[in-house]
Amino acid sequence: MVTKNSTRTEVKALAQNIHMSPFKARRVIDQIRGRSYEETLMILELMPYRAAFTILKLVYSAAANANNLGLNEAESFISKAEVNGGTVLKRLRPRARGRSYRIKRPTCHITIVLKDKSKNL
């Protein structure tokens, strides 16, 4: 159940344990931090990186959260966008002569916070 509160001006969307290196996700996040919602959508749709699609879905989720709380997503901007490292999955890769090497598969947590410009003034 969602209760509507008119004093709330920011909404958050969080994606955890994304199978992606935090460094590769930060490369995309640094391009959208502080930009408006519509400008962010245009940037992410044209980016060739794999992380852009995951972050685009997360921005859509944050906009849906804003809509559920009665905020206008067209007048919002990305006030906070961060990528934190998650757990590292350790796998074994078979090698020659019966040996094996450890493969590290990193994960990350991505947080997007949308803030409303009109209620922020």
UniProtKB/Swiss-Prot annotation:
The keyword Cell membrane does not apply. Part of the 50S ribosomal subunit. This protein binds specifically to 23S rRNA. The globular domain of the protein is located near the polypeptide exit tunnel on the outside of the subunit, while an extended beta-hairpin is found that lines the wall of the exit tunnel in the center of the 70S ribosome. It comes from Lemna minor (Common duckweed). This is Large ribosomal subunit protein uL22c. GO terms for molecular function: rRNA binding; structural constituent of ribosome. It is found in: Plastid, Chloroplast. Pfam families: Ribosomal_L22 (PF00237). It comes from the Eukaryota. Belongs to the universal ribosomal protein uL22 family. GO terms for biological process: translation.
